[in-house]
Amino acid sequence: MAKKKAKKSIAKGVVYVAATFNNTVITVTDEMGNVISWSSAGALGFKGSKKSTPFAATEAVADAMAKAKENGIKEVGIKVQGPGSGRDTAVKAIGATEGIRVTFLKDITPLPHNGCRPPKKRRV
């Protein structure tokens, strides 16, 4: 039988929002970068194109923040990465979470200084 995971009491944390065109992944860490909780649209049962919707991102945030609050998180900073549609909605949902105070918001999307050639444009 597996041992029950010990509850940590961490007051401050960082929420990483990775918003791709296909999915939105939310990871809550402590200040050192150790993962406390995570959630994604796909992990919540959204399939296919429904994973990339703003609603799916909101649900993923609610799930990850509920797990984080169990561990005592009260203050978070937000780091957002990627161009996905769930990006803005996820940030708003974190801000609207009861009992959580947002300290900073930072965009950490990697931008090339003219690196790799991008994929060809779609012709539909």
Curated annotation (Swiss-Prot):
UniProt keyword annotations, A-Z: Ribonucleoprotein, Ribosomal protein, RNA-binding, rRNA-binding
Protein known as: Small ribosomal subunit protein uS11
InterPro entries reported for this sequence: Ribosomal_uS11 (IPR001971), Ribosomal_uS11_bac-type (IPR019981), Ribosomal_uS11_CS (IPR018102), Ribosomal_uS11_sf (IPR036967)
Gene Ontology MF annotations: rRNA binding; structural constituent of ribosome
Gene Ontology terms describing biological process: translation
Organism: Sulfurovum sp. (strain NBC37-1)
GO cellular component term of the entry, any: ribosome
Taxon lineage: Bacteria, Pseudomonadati, Campylobacterota, Epsilonproteobacteria, Campylobacterales
Pfam family, one: Ribosomal_S11
Coiled-coil boundaries: none
UniProt similarity note: Belongs to the universal ribosomal protein uS11 family.
Keyword presence, Glycoprotein: no
Function: Located on the platform of the 30S subunit, it bridges several disparate RNA helices of the 16S rRNA. Forms part of the Shine-Dalgarno cleft in the 70S ribosome.
Quaternary structure annotation from Swiss-Prot or TrEMBL: Part of the 30S ribosomal subunit. Interacts with proteins S7 and S18. Binds to IF-3.
Lipoprotein is among the record's keywords: no
Designated gene of the protein: rpsK
